[in-house]
Amino acid sequence: MQGFGCGHCYSFRKMTSNTQPPTPAAIPAIAASHCAPAPSAWIVRFAHLLRPQGSVLDLACGMGRHTRFLSALNHALTSVDKAPEATRSVADIAETITADIENSAWPLTGRSFDGVVVTNYLWRPLWPLILASVKPGGVLLYETFAQGNEAYGKPSRPDFLLAPAELLQVCAGWNIVAYEHGLLHQPERVVQRIAAIRPGGPAAPAALLQA
C-alpha cells in the first residue's frame, strides 16, 4: 500500500474556467478521452455527486489519474502523496502537497473539501481526519483492497485489507449512495468501495443520487 515521505512541499496553480459543468451522462466519455491511465470505474461512476467546480482532495494520489480526471471536470484539486515525482506530475493542474501523513502532522488541518477521493490506500488512524476533511453535504469516494484479496496477491496483510462492511461502519450516519465488496477482474482483486455523503449540507437532487 502506498505511504508518504517526509516533509511538506506545496505548489499550486489557480485554475479558472467558464465552462459549464458536464452532465452525468458525459462524464464517462470525458474519462475515456482525457485520462491515461484510466481512473477507477467507481470514481467515474460517482463523480457526478461532486458539487460542480467544487474543491476535491485526492489523497494518496499516486501519479494523478484521478487528479487529471477530476481536473477535466473543472474541479479544484488538492493532491497529496508521498513521492515528489508524483506530486510534480500534477503540479500544473492542482495544489500539491508532499507530506508524511502517517508519521507527521496532518498537513490539511482546518481545511475541508466538497469531495474526498481515496483509492488503493488504507491507514486506519487517518479515518477521523479523512472524514473531517469532507464538508457537510460533501462526498467521500473510497475504494481499496479488502479481505479476500490475499487469495489473489498483494496486499495480503490484514492491516491493508478492509474487513467486511468496514466502510459502512466508518461512514455510519452518512447518506450511503452505494457500497460494494467483491471481486474485480483485469487484474483479479477483491475491493471494497463506497460513495457516501456527509450529512448537514443541502439535500442533493434525487437524480444525482442514482448509481
Regions found by a protein language model. Give the residues of each.
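Core SAM-dependent methyltransferase catalytic element
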Residues: 185-211
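Conserved class I S-adenosyl-L-methionine
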Residues: 53-62
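Class I SAM-dependent methyltransferase SAM/SAH-binding core
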Residues: 63-103
